[in-house]
């Protein structure tokens, strides 16, 4: 039987957070550090697949620490060059609803960082 530590260390952790370019930089730094922490704990990061603000920072933090990143993004956001193509996996879906559904389906745990109405709507 696997140990609890080995099970926990293989989790996919979804992070919901702001993608606004106007959010206070202290939150962007917080997201980056969380991404690093997820990766150094041998977990995988799941995000909404964007490259800016907190969403981009959490992924950069995970990658900088050698972690795996998985993004899920609607085609409409890919079309406006919002996608983080540096993700190890980038799943493109049709709608925001499909994005939420896939993120919740593939993730084992969830973290919510500061954000606005879009972050709140994730729940």
Task: Please tell me what each predicted stretch does.
Residues 2-68:
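Glycine-rich beta-alpha loop segments
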Residues 8, 85, 105:
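Structured loop/turn residues at beta-strand edges in well-structured enzyme cores
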Residues 18-21, 51, 75-77, 109, ...:
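Short glycine-rich anion-binding loops that position phosphate/pyrophosphate groups of nucleotides
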Residues 22, 26, 83, 94, ...:
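N-terminal alpha/beta PP-like core and its mobile active-site loop of ThDP/TPP-dependent enzymes
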Residues 26, 57, 81-83, 102, ...:
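Short, well-ordered secondary-structure micro-motifs
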Residues 42, 87-88, 107:
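Short, well-ordered alpha-helix to beta-strand connector turns
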Residues 47-96:
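Glycine-rich, small/polar surface segments that engage phosphate groups of diverse ligands
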Residues 98-123:
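Active-site/ligand-binding-proximal alpha/beta "capping" segment
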